[in-house]
A protein has these predicted regions:
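Phosphate/dinucleotide-binding and metal-coordinating scaffold of catalytic cores
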Residues: 1-447
């Protein structure tokens, strides 16, 4: 981690994954566990080190790789990994992961992070990197021996580059990437929903969230020859104090926090929901702000029709001494532009939030969630004195946020995309404004 030896990850044949923390790391001023689910205190002491074993160790590392089998197979072929298992893949591509760790074969030196090693790219070079992102190695070709081997979790096609001295670069050795490039999604899911404009849509959603005053990653739309990408500035990277090199910032997503594999990222599949995450955020350095903003984000996702707010799309920054706080938001996509019936569309009555709103029963369907559900859940989470202000603030901010963003859309931004999202959000807040805080007896009988 930033040149410091943390420990070893092993997968002995026939036994559980094993993580051994080095004592020097544990005792260091900068030392911290890799995850809240893998604390120092729960490790078994022995031979000057501490060891953890089991499913939580395996889950932590599995969450560092993409959770898309097609992407995993392509990475295996491209880099000559033995298999698509997390251990074999990360042995090949674990030099630049989400967060701060670098995974290297035993005995390999990590390199000097204080010295930037990179190959500068022109526009054609960046375009070529983006084109090659989705390509596998052809039969008979040698594995890609580029020294920069990165692993970015998630289900979307993406790559990463370094921004150095005003130019895009391929980093090498210990030098980290600073920006993630996300390619258009295309047709996605079982219904093959048309998300070919996902780059513009995600930019729109991220900038809308910024207009509401919530912490969110900086994004821009990049075009390089015939290639287009959403460029996200990494908040797990920061310049060193002297400004001459980059440091990696430890972080983990909420699947890692809770020790769960990525196939349980949705609450309906056994992942953490709003209540579990709100409980964890009680231990944050910024507990009050982090908890209120997390609840506010869930309500805003309902307004936006953003259905992918699962456990991997919320993260913590890990600080020395076991301290932590929430990271900025990222990976926000509204489904409003595809709400209709027909080919490549999503039935709006089937649109579900990733985390249930609990108020008596558990509610996932967006159309079935009402103001009184949000109020009831907020009260059960200890936000009774804040929920009315949060709801009214979102109602009042929505027209201002939409107007402000409309004035700074890029020149070639598709106006119909903005209008669809704006109309859907406006309808949602009007409904929120007219509904009561308490469900009436008449509505109970009606249902």
């Amino acid at each position: 981690m930033n040149g410091f030896y943390v420990g070893t990850w092993e997968r002995p044949k026939g036994t559980a994954d094993r993580l051994t923390y080095d004592t020097r790391w544990i005792q260091s001023d900068t030392g911290r566990p890799l995850s809240l689910s893998l604390p120092f205190g729960h490790a078994h002491r022995g031979d000057g080190a501490q060891t953890l074993r089991g499913d939580k160790v395996a889950a932590y590392f599995e969450n560092l790789i993409p959770d898309n089998e097609r992407i995993l197979q392509r990475l295996r072929d491209r880099y000559g990994a033995r298999s698509t298992t997390p251990f074999d893949l990360l042995a090949a591509i674990g030099r630049d992961c989400v967060g701060a760790i670098q995974l290297l074969p035993a005995g390999t030196e990590p390199g000097d992070i204080r010295h930037i090693e990179a190959t500068s790219l022109n526009e054609a070079g960046v375009a070529n990197v983006l084109r090659n992102t989705t390509l596998s190695r052809h039969p008979g070709e040698a594995p890609d021996d580029d020294a920069f081997r990165l692993s970015i979790a998630g289900a979307q096609e993406k790559t990463a580059l370094l921004r150095h001295r005003g130019r895009w670069c391929i980093p090498h050795g210990a030098t980290p990437s600073t920006h993630i490039f996300k390619l258009p999604l295309g047709l996605v899911g079982n219904v093959q929903a048309d998300m070919r404009m996902s780059v513009e849509l995600e930019w729109l959603c991220m900038e809308l969230v910024r207009e509401y005053g919530l912490p969110v990653a900086h994004v821009e739309i990049g075009r390089f020859e015939d290639q287009k990408a959403l460029i996200l500035e990494r908040f797990d990277r920061v310049r060193a104090r002297d400004g001459h090199y980059w440091l990696r910032i430890p972080q983990e997503d909420f699947c890692q926090v809770t020790g769960l594999p990525p196939n349980r990222k949705y609450e309906s599949d056994g992942g953490p929901g709003i209540r579990r995450i709100m409980d964890i955020l009680r231990g944050s350095e910024n507990a009050d702000a982090d908890r209120e903003n997390f609840f506010r984000t869930q309500l805003l996702f309902w307004i936006m029709g953003a259905t992918d707010g699962h456990a991997k799309n919320f993260s913590l920054t890990l600080l020395p001494g076991g301290r932590y706080r929430r990271t900025p938001l990222y990976d926000i996509l509204s489904t409003l532009p595809i709400h209709s019936r027909g080919a490549n569309r999503m039935d709006p009555h089937k649109a579900r939030l990733a985390m249930a709103v609990e108020s008596g029963n558990r509610h996932y369907l967006i159309h079935d969630i009402h103001r009184w559900h949000w109020v009831g859940m907020a009260e059960s989470l200890g936000l009774a004195d804040r929920v009315a202000a949060v709801i009214e603030d979102l109602i009042e901010r929505t027209p201002r946020a939409l107007d402000a963003l409309a004035k700074r859309l890029p020149e070639d931004f598709p106006t119909e995309l903005f209008d669809t999202v704006a109309n859907g959000m406006t309808a949602a807040v009007k409904r929120l404004a007219r509904e009561p805080d308490r469900r009436s007896v008449a509505s109970v009988r009606k249902r």
